[in-house]
């Protein structure tokens, strides 16, 4: 990370896409995409996904590390080009508890991530706990972030500290996505970004963490990009011009969250304007979902009814029977909720892919289609971009390859934005 930031600050229009997903096919797609490029790949876990208690994935930080390393070994991707990051590390998961208890758990969370070898750490203590006022005083946020940084510094070995980096600040929606429709987005004011930096500098120095300040590489801000279930708010460079200019006077860059579904030109503009770390998550699993749905349509054309996976029906049954991950996010009317379940840009389906019934049906779908030849016309009908790549001779038409390539369509847009010499 430090090398990428140094190159950016030296004037090179370079950035990095942060892959925020625990789905094995998404991680495989990212690693295969850059297998021969020489580029680093940044993969991040959030505190609610992965923590010392297991998170909703059931993985602790060391488990997630081993999970990613296992995929890298299968792909042949060298570990030295992998960067592991932790996102929203702080009391996010324990906001319903008193601040003292939540911060004790947050300190242990940080220690677990650093001990597992994660080198990019987002120190996010912005959320109010059960006995806190709302919103929190910025100095309280900074002091708590400093305590988290102290935990990281005492845990890291001297060798780890050579690569350890921190991200501070937060001006993002709740981790996991917006719960309601958006109409406009407030772009961070440059004076607020400056205050974030100043309060954190003061809090770090008060704990004797002057050396750690040199490891702070980025500030999270809102440059004016967002999405909800049906809408995308696109980047408007002019609206963020003052913010973009301010960061030039610091040794840092910005980190932008919720950059999913922006255009490839927007990614290039964001990197040009010093939002050099671009987070993406739901857009990747949305592409995965599109690929699974497309393959299900092909299966209906090629496989006899009694042999089909029924994957779309299984998804519906599971999500309707177990609505915990989507109910408070989607519209209450049944017909509208079904559209959201299938096609929402926030892609709450992503929480259901590990479900045993859904996983088994996806495996059967892929097995069924592996046993037949996929007609080019059928691929053209349901996956036209992949059909073009087949025609160019750069893709072999297996179900697995089609899924991987579909996810990589998203990554191609980020590569265009993050790599100046890509046309």
From Swiss-Prot:
Transmembrane segments: none annotated. GO terms for biological process: D-tagatose 6-phosphate catabolic process; galactitol metabolic process; phosphoenolpyruvate-dependent sugar phosphotransferase system. Pathway: Carbohydrate metabolism; D-tagatose 6-phosphate degradation; D-glyceraldehyde 3-phosphate and glycerone phosphate from D-tagatose 6-phosphate: step 2/2. Keywords: Galactitol metabolism. One of its GO terms (cellular component) is plasma membrane. The keyword Glycosyltransferase does not apply. InterPro entries: Aldolase_TIM, GatZ/KbaZ-like, GatZ_KbaZ_carbometab, TagBP_ald_GatZ. The keyword Acyltransferase does not apply. Pfam families: GatZ_KbaZ-like. SUPFAM superfamilies: Aldolase. Belongs to the GatZ/KbaZ family. GatZ subfamily. Forms a complex with GatY. Component of the tagatose-1,6-bisphosphate aldolase GatYZ that is required for full activity and stability of the Y subunit. Could have a chaperone-like function for the proper and stable folding of GatY. When expressed alone, GatZ does not show any aldolase activity. Is involved in the catabolism of galactitol. This is D-tagatose-1,6-bisphosphate aldolase subunit GatZ. It comes from Salmonella dublin (strain CT_02021853).
């Amino acid at each position: 990370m430090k090398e990428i930031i140094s190159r950016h600050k030296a004037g090179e229009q370079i950035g990095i896409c942060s892959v925020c997903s625990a789905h094995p096919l998404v991680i495989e797609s990212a690693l295969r995409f850059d297998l021969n490029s020489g580029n680093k790949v940044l993969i991040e876990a959030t505190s609610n996904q992965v923590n010392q208690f297991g998170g909703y994935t059931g993985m602790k930080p060391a488990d997630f590390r081993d999970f990613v390393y296992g995929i890298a070994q299968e792909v042949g991707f060298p570990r030295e080009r992998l960067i592991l990051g932790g996102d929203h590390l702080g009391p996010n998961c324990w906001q319903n508890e008193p601040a003292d208890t939540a911060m004790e758990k947050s300190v242990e969370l940080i220690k677990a991530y650093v001990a597992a070898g994660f080198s990019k750490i987002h120190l996010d203590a912005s959320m109010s706990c059960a006995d806190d006022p709302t919103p929190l005083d910025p100095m309280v946020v900074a002091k708590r972030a400093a305590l988290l940084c102290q935990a990281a510094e005492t845990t890291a070995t001297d060798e780890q500290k050579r690569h350890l980096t921190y991200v501070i600040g937060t001006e993002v929606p709740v981790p996991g996505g917006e719960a309601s429709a958006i109409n406009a987005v407030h772009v961070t004011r440059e004076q607020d970004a400056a205050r974030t930096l100043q309060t954190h500098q003061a809090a770090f120095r008060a704990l004797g963490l002057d050396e750690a300040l040199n490891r702070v590489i980025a500030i999270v801000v809102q440059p004016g990009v967002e999405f909800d279930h049906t809408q995308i708010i696109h980047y408007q460079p002019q609206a963020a011009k003052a913010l973009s200019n301010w960061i030039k006077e610091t040794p840092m860059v910005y980190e932008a969250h919720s950059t999913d579904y922006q255009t490839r030109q927007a990614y290039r503009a964001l990197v040009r304007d010093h939002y050099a770390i671009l987070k993406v998550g739901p857009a990747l699993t949305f592409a995965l979902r599109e690929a699974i749905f497309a393959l299900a349509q092909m299966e209906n054309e090629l496989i006899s009814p009694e042999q089909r996976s029924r994957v779309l029906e299984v998804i519906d049954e599971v999500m309707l029977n177990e609505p915990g991950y989507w109910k408070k996010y989607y519209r209450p009317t049944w017909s509208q909720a079904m559209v959201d379940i299938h096609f929402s840009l926030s892609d709450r389906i992503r929480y259901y892919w590990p479900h045993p019934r859904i996983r088994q049906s996806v495996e059967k779908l892929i097995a069924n289609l592996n046993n037949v030849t996929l007609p080019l016309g059928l691929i053209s009908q349901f996956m036209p971009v992949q059909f073009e790549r087949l025609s160019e001779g750069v893709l072999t038409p297996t179900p697995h390859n089609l899924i991987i390539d579909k996810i990589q369509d998203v990554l191609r847009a980020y590569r265009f934005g993050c790599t100046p010499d890509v046309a």
